[in-house]
Amino acid sequence: MISEKEELLEWRKRAAAQPKGRVVLDLEADSLHRYQEKICLIQYADETGSCLIDPLAIEDMSPFYNWLRDTEVWMHGADYDMCLFQRAWETLPAMIWDTQTAARLLGFRQFGLAALVEHFHGVTLSKSSQKADWARRPLSPTMVTYALN
């Protein structure tokens, strides 16, 4: 888990080297547990692997949001995450490819991430930590596993 600015700077170098359109992002927030929600965890994946970024532990997230505004990303159900990005850092990705929107346009009746992953890959995703309090630290092993999957 990336929880220090120096680690974030190293991550940014690696992320900047990835081909456009080959980056996946997801966010976890604490909207079910706090009145003014905030981004509690950033899940990042590319062709070389995945990692978790802890924005609650890193005071200066500018390496992330500066990278974000020049990046094409894949997300699922990106509308809420875009609101969080805009509210937290007043920025958005350069381009967003939303798999939920694509599934709806293609006529899928079940367009949730779990349904699509099962349909295309035969893998059942756990929803065990979907409603967890992502602002609590340390994250439990179950939450970390959920976030990386």
Residue ranges and their predicted role:
Residues A103, F120, W134-A135:
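Residue-level signal for alpha-helical context at structural boundaries
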Residues L125-N149:
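Acidic, Mg2+-coordinating catalytic module of metal-dependent nucleases/exonucleases
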Residues L113-S126:
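A polyampholytic, Gly/Pro-enriched intrinsically disordered region
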Residues T48, F120, S129:
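Residue-level signal for pocket-adjacent positions within structured domains
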Residues M1-A115:
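Conserved RNase H-like, two-metal-ion catalytic cores of nucleic-acid enzymes
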